Structure formats: structure tokens, C-alpha cells
Regions:
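Charge-dense, low-complexity polyampholytic segments
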Residues: 23, 28-31, 87-90
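Aromatic side chains
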Residues: 13, 39-43, 85
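A short, surface-exposed interaction/processing loop segment used at functional sites
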Residues: 60-87
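Short alpha-helical interface patches
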Residues: 3-6, 82-90
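Histidine-/acidic-rich catalytic cores in large beta-rich domains
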Residues: 3, 11, 52-54, 73
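Exposed beta-strand-loop-beta-strand "reactive/processing" segments of non-cytosolic proteins
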Residues: 26-66
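Short, non-transmembrane alpha-helical segments in secretory-pathway proteins
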Residues: 1-28
Length: 90
């Protein structure tokens, strides 16, 4: 799997959350992490990403992992540091 393919999978997943959260969501591509197991994608509301106005920031939007081998998506969490969640994939 390529990063482009993983990005498409992540974007479809994030777009599927828009109705639930009530706003347009975007991937923060400059924050994407590549690891041996796959890619870690971050997302936020389009308004917050474009304006930086915290009134439009999402809460609880944990990074998602797209696995390199099969394209499966795993959601992380926000209670622990990101590295704690990523250890399970290494």
C-alpha cells in the first residue's frame, strides 16, 4: 500500500464522520506520521484548520491508523499520549 492509497482510505473514514460531528472535516496532511506498520492521520474541522479559531476545533478527534498491509483503520484515543496507542502496532 502506498501513502496515497492510505490517505484515500483515511479521508473516506473521516468524511464518514461529518454527519455525526456536524461539520466538514479535513485531514491535517502535514502532521501525518509514517511508521513501519502504516500511517497515522490527524484530522480536524475545516474551519479550525483554515482559521486557527479554537471555537471551531474538534474535541476527541483521536488520530487514526491505516495499516500498511491490509488498509484496516484503527482509531487511537485521547486519554494517553499517542505513542502509547501506537505501541500496540509495533
Amino acid at each position: 500500500m502506498t501513502k496515497v492509497e492510505a490517505t484515500q482510505i483515511a479521508l473516506r473514514h473521516v468524511k464518514g464522520k461529518e454527519q455525526e460531528v456536524g461539520c466538514e472535516l479535513v485531514l491535517l496532511e502535514n502532521k501525518t506520521l509514517e511508521r513501519q506498520f502504516g500511517w497515522v492521520f490527524f484530522y480536524d474541522s475545516r474551519l479550525h484548520a483554515e482559521t486557527g479559531d479554537f471555537r471551531h476545533a474538534l474535541a476527541g478527534n483521536a488520530p487514526i491508523v491505516v495499516m500498511r498491509g491490509d488498509g484496516k483503520i484503527h482509531e487511537t484515543g485521547t486519554a494517553l499520549p499517542l505513542e502509547e496507542y501506537l505501541r500496540q502496532f509495533e
